[in-house]
Amino acid sequence: MELILQGTEITPPIRFGLDRLPADGIRRLTLDRQEASAAGGYRRKAEGTDITVSAPDDSGFMYALLDLAEELHGGIRPEDAEVVPYIRNRGIKFNIPLDARVPSYTDAGTSAFMNIANMWDMEFWREFLDRMAENKYNVLSLWTLSPFPALVRIPEFPEACIDDVMVSAVPVKATTRGIGMYSEDMADHLVTVRKMTIEEKTEFWRQVMSYARDRCIQVFLFTWNVFTYGTEGNPYGITDDQYSPVTREYYYYGTRALMDAFPLLAGIGITAGENMTFRGSSEVNKNPDYKMDDIDFSVQTYGKAVHDYLQEHPGREFRVIHRMQMARYKDILHAFSRIPQEIDISFKYSQAHMYSSTRPQFIADFLEEKDPDTRFWLTVRNDDFYMLRWGNPDFARAYLLNMPVGDMIGFYMGPDGLIWGRDYFSRSAGEHPLFVDRMWYMFRIWGELSYNIHRPDSWFVRLISGRFGIPEEEAEALYEAWKEASATVQETTCVHWHNFDFQWYPEGCCMRDDHAEKIIFYTVDEFMRCPSITGGEYASVAETAEALVHRRPTERISAEETAASILRHAEKAAEILGRFDASGTENGELRRTIADIRAFVRLGSYYGMKIKAAIRLCMYRATGDETARSEAVDLLEKAAEAWRSYSSLISGNYRPQVLPRLGAKIDVTDFDEITDLDILIAKNMQPDRAIR
């Protein structure tokens, strides 16, 4: 292949793309740098085996070459193309378990414990960052409660840092607020998994950020506050007290030290909680206990440090992102204007459940309140599926198209309830591949469509065909079955809504009672009471039953319609899989994928029947109609069978793990007997005509 360079040179990102090209298929490749194109996008002109790619920057060239390589490897003849990135910044939210002594929000779980050593393995980061680039993600946000001690030596607080990388043989106490996650008994049972000085740690993360730059990925650091893990026993008087002058100095100088140590760090994200003065609901606009003290801490520490550092280093680019959690938009802007320091705003778009409505309404008030020129980031919480391989491009496309893209800087997607490091769930993981490799289809769907929203269904069919080495006809069937099965739990969550991940874990139909510190399986009576998604187009079970009792239509999509839709998705997926014969395949990944789709079908069937039963029990309570109760009992008996079938599949393919946001080891087979209680609940229920 003849390579012609016009206005550019072979940089590491371009080399990464070139190395993916096959040996044959191109006679002449011209790379032409043109500033007029959209940042990160490209134009391609194809004349037979002569290809010209025009792009304004390295990322545009890299993505163009990756797309070209994929087409050529798939036997597709390249055609003219133009891509303008749909969303400029497409990110991953990664809660990072650096050390038992400096936990992240997610460290009270199996995946964090197993991944601590991996976070200090450069080979892991090469794999992970390569995968991000291949899937068109260009922002990596690393989230931790107490970043400074494991990353830098602060000149003003030189002893407030930790050497080596350690885990503890004593588990982390589960908490939903990040408080008390490193204790004396953990300290008494520390084990060193990697010997490193703090200077070597700093150099390690410089290398990670350098490699990220070579894949056109910006790295951000996000914190919660106020947490001073890793400074225990310090001689300076650093504590978690946000009013302490010493603590404020520690945060101020720590932020400056981060900026100085990591020239490639793109910015820092700030949360006004979870360990600050205001500990009420995140619905701050409705809470009389809310006050400005927490935002003031952010201003006087992070904000002032960034402002002062940039004044001294005017060529440095650095973003400050303030989350809307436990803070009011106008208060944030007003407080930071006093420095003054320009900031970005971040909003949690679907609360903890992105797999719900394609048009979440939680952001509606903020969009009305914000200044017209305010641009913001979206946090997109991916906390519904830790085991099952999700795959529904139709849902992702609609979700992305409904985002307020014109006002956005970008988004970052990821969980609080799992570490997206190496996979320790799968019983057949072998060498423990990247979690994002097991979830490759989900990872690809969101990255690709947020970059190129115009990717058609046929593109994903070819992707599946190439991944599994199956004919396109079979790939099309698998695409449809996967899409239909994945839709079941999304629709369930729209009817059975709880804001937070610990309140609703769909793969286990359970929640954590934070006060009692117990795992509770959601029985049918809870489904009867549970609201539907806030501000959405879905009616709850109770609303639907009331409408049916009074023979009037619901203003929103009824829970009966939703349950019927869930069951149709499950039945269609099952019917397609019944025609799809992969019994003789030697492709283990394909077999495991089909098993996951079957598990989705059974879980969806369970939820569809349980919702229908809950509606009928609401009607029975209101009217005493025994027919409604009889139908509910029949549905719940079938639902219990579906659950057992689901749990059997899960237990055969996945190891139970301690999930940090639930604070316990979740084994779905433990709930088999509880599903039978739903039948007894229905049989023992008494009518309450006062409801009518």
Give names to the regions the model predicted.
Residues 661-692:
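A eukaryotic intrinsically disordered, low-complexity regulatory tract that is acidic and Ser/Pro-rich
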Residues 95, 115, 138, 152-160, ...:
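Catalytic-core regions of glycoside hydrolase
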Residues 224-248, 266, 273-279, 284, ...:
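Aromatic-lined, polymer-binding surfaces characteristic
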Residues 415-420, 429-672:
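C-terminal non-catalytic alpha-helical accessory regions
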Residues 18-33:
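Short acidic low-complexity segments
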Residues 1-13, 35-41, 45-247, 263-264, ...:
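Feature activates predominantly on carbohydrate-active enzymes
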